[in-house]
Design a protein with these regions (language model features):
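N-terminal secretory signal peptides that target proteins for export/translocation
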Residues: 1-12
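N-terminal, active-site-proximal structural segment of metallo-dependent hydrolase catalytic domains
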Residues: 11, 30, 34-116, 132, ...
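Bacterial N-terminal signal peptides
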Residues: 17-29
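Metal-dependent phosphoester-hydrolase catalytic domains
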Residues: 38-44, 215-226, 233-331
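Structured beta-strand-rich core segments of catalytic domains in phosphoester-bond hydrolases
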Residues: 41-47, 99, 103-190, 308-309
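Active-site beta-strand/loop signature of hydrolases that rely on acidic residues for catalysis
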Residues: 54-60, 88-110, 138, 170, ...
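Short catalytic/ligand-binding loop motif for oxyanion handling, primarily in non-cytosolic enzymes
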Residues: 63-66, 108-111, 132-137, 191-194, ...
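Surface-exposed cleft-lining segments at the edges of enzyme active sites
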Residues: 72-77, 151-160, 188-203
Length: 331
């Protein structure tokens, strides 16, 4: 009897370590599978082949009033936030970015839009306390983990109309493999030098603050790739953008390996004009006419932009004057 007990005990001792190995494998497997691939891989408009991260950027036009402008009423249209919010939700769910950046994001629109996209898995990285953040970053919670977030409102107030000009920076870790990158979303001062002398230098100074912020981020997290996106209210050839390019920032459309949209990304949409596909920018092309930009700083040369696109779906024309920008890249 004693021998049989020993044999039985040995079997248990052998079995238990194998059981632990199997359980450990299952836990690791579940962990990997729960850290999903980019949501854009299953979106209506799927992630480009060989890309693994998607950024979607848009200035969504702050119209926080609860009245319909006469021009819109004459067109039989309604630009109020509760009407436009479902269309922005459609945009976001059609493309399902890992990272979403918005400008002119009012608290009024937040009440309408955020509940819609939160249920899709998006988290706002900085909800304002004292100051409302008009330039938020959202991330897809199942694929991304924030390591660092900062909001900065530009000063002095003369270059920051109603507190709307700011930047939000975020450092994100991809849950599936731990790779880290950063995104900075901004909206710069809007007037020309003719309207308000010093405006170009104000924008240049605001971008210098972003460049300093990027240096701080990279000092802390290493030479990670950084995307700077948003409505910069100036063309690529101007001093504000050229200072960034001189420091190694590259416009994403110029390095996209599979597709690069070259339109200026802007059209008529406002309370007084209604909406149309007419563009009033300085030029029809991106280099000379665009004011919405996406630049990449990648000193290691490991990040590849696959697609840079300007989304011109018909329904977007009457929800904002800025066509949304999309960047698919391989981290």
């Amino acid at each position: 009897m004693r021998d049989s007990v020993v044999v039985k005990d040995m079997r248990v001792r052998v079995f238990v370590p194998w059981l632990l190995v199997v359980l450990n494998f299952l836990v690791v497997s579940v962990g990997v599978s729960s850290a999903q691939a980019s949501p854009a891989s299953k979106a209506r408009y799927k992630l480009a082949e060989s890309a693994d991260v998607r950024i979607l950027d848009d200035n969504i036009w702050d119209y926080s009033l609860d009245t319909i402008p006469p021009k819109w009423k004459a067109m039989g249209e309604d630009p109020r936030d509760f009407v436009r919010a479902p269309q922005f939700e459609r945009l976001i769910t059609d493309y399902m970015p890992d990272v979403l950046t918005l400008q002119e994001y009012s608290s009024h629109m937040h009440d309408e839009l955020y509940p819609r996209i939160a249920k899709e898995g998006y988290v706002i990285a900085w909800e304002s306390g004292k100051d409302w953040n008009n330039t938020p970053v959202f991330y897809y919670e199942k694929t991304m983990e924030p390591l660092y977030v900062k909001y900065h409102k530009y000063t002095p107030a003369q270059w920051c109309n109603r507190g709307t000009k700011s930047f939000t920076s975020i450092v994100l870790k991809r849950k599936s493999d731990g790779q880290v990158f950063s995104v900075v979303n901004t909206h710069l001062w809007w007037k020309s030098d003719q309207m308000q002398p010093g405006s170009t230098m104000a924008r240049a100074s605001q971008l210098r603050l972003i460049m300093a912020e990027v240096e701080i981020i990279r000092a802390r997290f290493g030479s990670i790739p950084v995307f700077v996106v948003g409505d910069m209210n100036c063309e690529e050839k101007t001093v504000p953008l050229q200072q960034m390019i001189a420091e190694g920032y590259v416009p994403c459309y110029k390095v996209a390996v599979k597709h690069a949209d070259n339109s200026n990304g802007h059209h008529v949409c406002g309370p007084d004009d209604g909406f149309s596909t007419e563009s009033r920018r300085a030029a029809p092309d991106r280099e000379n006419g665009a004011i919405d930009h996406c630049l990449l700083l990648d000193t290691e040369g490991k990040t590849e932009v696959i697609v840079f696109d300007c989304i011109m779906d018909e329904y977007t024309v009457k929800i904002t004057d800025h066509y949304p920008l999309l960047v698919d890249f391989k981290l």
